[in-house]
């Protein structure tokens, strides 16, 4: 029973993904991903595998926030993320397999930073293409060299 129309009003408010939220996530997240990836790389180089695991988790949280925002979808929470991404239109190539491999990789695996960087690069390329955001080269480190950072976005 929705006598006062409050349920109807709530459904209308959440029926479309807020453009301002999407814009904020897509503007701020690339820099966060760059920072976390740089920290992950430095932690790996010094053998701090606990920090590598922490940065991988930070990258995952930011990455999925960005992926759902790009697709105009509310983030479903931490459970069954890959199941939820299967319904998204804009995804990096072979995303599910590659993400699973990354998550199952040991934190001391030599390829962990390059696999992570590859997925981040492809997500940022999708943002650039789908959101028509201009990017400029990053100045983070050699693992992130030439990688995009948000410059001046335009909504699409």
Say what each PLM segment does.
Residues 1-47, 145-156:
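Conserved NTP/Mg2+-binding pocket subregion across the NTase superfamily
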Residues 25-29, 55-56, 112-119:
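Amphipathic alpha-helix face/heptad-repeat signature
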Residues 72-100:
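Short, charged amphipathic alpha-helical segments flanked by flexible coils
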Residues 55-62, 83-84:
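Small-residue-rich helix-loop
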Residues 38, 42-45, 64-75, 79, ...:
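Charged/polar positions within long, soluble alpha-helices
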């Amino acid at each position: 029973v929705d006598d006062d129309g409050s349920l109807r009003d709530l459904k209308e408010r959440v029926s479309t993904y807020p453009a301002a939220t999407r814009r904020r996530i897509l503007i701020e997240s690339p820099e966060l991903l760059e920072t976390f990836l740089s920290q992950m790389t430095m932690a790996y180089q010094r053998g701090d595998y606990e920090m590598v695991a922490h940065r991988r988790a930070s990258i995952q949280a930011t990455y999925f926030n960005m992926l759902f925002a790009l697709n105009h979808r509310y983030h479903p929470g931490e459970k069954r993320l890959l199941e939820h991404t299967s319904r998204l239109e804009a995804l990096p190539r072979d995303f599910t397999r590659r993400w699973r491999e990354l998550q199952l990789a040991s934190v001391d695996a030599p390829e962990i930073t390059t696999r992570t960087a590859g997925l981040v690069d492809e997500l940022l390329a999708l943002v650039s293409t789908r959101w028509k955001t201009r990017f400029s080269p990053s100045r983070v480190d050699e693992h992130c060299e030439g990688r995009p950072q948000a410059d001046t976005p335009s909504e699409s």
